[in-house]
């Protein structure tokens, strides 16, 4: 922090120029950046039968849920109780995206905490009268100074929950709306993984919006109506249940790993699969991408050498889109147990329909190092599995990189030092 302050000159000139601050803070460029960040962060988790994107010629849409018209919750934790800039809620974003021929009806339905279902009737009626329902649920952010649990935030520093399920009766609200038979889209507002098993099994479309910020309502609407093709990918693993915690993609080969790969007749727990609800790196698009022609050049290197991985990616759909190509590695044999896969690079590639591009990744000794039993960072000679795919669980292309022993210092078991230096 001190180095950054020195770099910015804050020790010699610690004061800001008020006139310049007025021009810069919340400028048009900053608002556009906030919108783009929200768009790119949204992850499409489910889209059964291509329910999304929606047509803007719908006659009626029901927007339901405690986070549908909640500006503060879109801003996340550590948000002032009084927000000076305007915030576009998801309800407002949907209203602004449709024409006058589309009737948008809003019903809160429930609170985020508590067991009050008195708003269910209004929500059910709104869903029944609409062509489509958008249910916006998730978490409560902010600060509370009361002992009433129902007035507390559910996410943020100092606020813990005992379950990863939706709090209060929000899960029941989704079920009630879905039971009307009206096609339903669930939008999540949250800062931690939510185990939405029922929705994942029964609701045709789920959009993970996180804490999308002041223009989050427009960003979500842009995704819902196809003005922006979703390209976000999960930077976390979403478990099916709190019983799966800790849940992360780069685990060591364990009983759970082998069970998930057919070691027993069970595929995980007695009650549910052992795989996550949504894996690390996962995210859908409104188009399809095909991977081909994996090349590892050269296929064999010395421990101190560099390597390049190439893959061809093609947009096989009818819409322009952005694919996030991910590179994972795994050392098959080594002196210590290594993770089943480790992310070593990713690239966002924009592709027009039918367009194909070659994506390349550079692998250096730092990428291949492991911490040995002597607590030294080393590159251990052997076979490395090279995996390129759409997520940690969707790997269409695999290859092998052979690393040979080198006579030089700092390789094959000798101390390489800190790989981050």
Set out the residue ranges of the language-model regions.
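C-terminal non-catalytic regions of proteins with extracellular/luminal or membrane-system context
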Residues: 3, 24-25, 32-421
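Flexible, acidic loop-helix segments that line cofactor/substrate-binding pockets
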Residues: 14-30
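Long, well-ordered, tryptophan-enriched scaffold segments
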Residues: 2-12
């Amino acid at each position: 922090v001190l180095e950054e302050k020195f770099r910015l000159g804050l020790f010699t000139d610690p004061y800001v120029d008020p006139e310049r601050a007025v021009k810069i803070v919340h400028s048009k460029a900053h608002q556009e950046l906030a919108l783009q960040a929200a768009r790119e962060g949204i992850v499409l988790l489910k889209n059964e039968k291509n329910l999304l994107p929606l047509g803007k010629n719908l006659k009626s849409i029901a927007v339901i849920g405690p986070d549908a018209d909640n500006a503060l919750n879109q801003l996340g934790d550590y948000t002032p109780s009084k927000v000076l800039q305007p915030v576009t809620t998801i309800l407002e974003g949907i209203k602004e995206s449709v024409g006058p021929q589309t009737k948008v009806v809003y019903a809160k339905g429930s609170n985020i905490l508590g067991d009050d279902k008195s708003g269910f009737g209004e929500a059910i009626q709104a869903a029944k009268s609409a062509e489509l329902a958008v249910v916006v649920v998730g978490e409560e952010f902010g600060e509370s100074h009361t002992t009433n649990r129902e007035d507390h935030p559910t996410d943020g520093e100092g606020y813990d929950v005992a379950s990863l399920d939706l709090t209060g009766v929000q899960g029941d609200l989704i079920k009630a709306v879905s039971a009307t038979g009206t096609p339903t889209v669930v939008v999540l507002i949250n800062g931690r993984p939510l185990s939405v098993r029922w929705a994942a099994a029964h609701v045709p479309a789920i959009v993970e919006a996180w804490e999308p910020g002041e223009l989050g309502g427009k960003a979500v609407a842009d995704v819902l109506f196809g003005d922006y093709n979703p390209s976000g990918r999960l930077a976390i693993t979403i478990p099916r249940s709190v019983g799966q915690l800790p849940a992360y993609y780069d685990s060591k080969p364990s009983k759970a790993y082998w069970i998930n790969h057919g070691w027993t007749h069970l595929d995980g727990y007695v009650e549910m699969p052992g795989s996550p609800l949504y894996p690390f790196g996962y995210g859908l698009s409104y188009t399809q991408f095909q991977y081909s022609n994996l090349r590892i050049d050269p296929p064999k290197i010395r421990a101190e050498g560099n390597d390049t991985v190439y893959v061809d990616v093609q947009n096989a759909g009818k819409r322009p889109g952005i694919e996030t190509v991910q590179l994972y590695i795994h050392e098959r044999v080594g002196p210590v147990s290594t993770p089943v896969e480790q992310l070593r690079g990713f690239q966002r590639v924009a592709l027009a329909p039918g367009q194909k591009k070659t994506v390349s990744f550079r692998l250096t000794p730092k990428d291949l190092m492991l911490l040995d039993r002597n607590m030294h960072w080393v590159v251990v000679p052997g076979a490395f599995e090279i995996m390129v795919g759409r997520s940690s669980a969707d790997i269409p292309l695999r290859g092998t990189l052979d690393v040979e022993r080198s006579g030089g210092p700092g390789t094959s078991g000798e101390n390489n030092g800190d790989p981050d230096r």
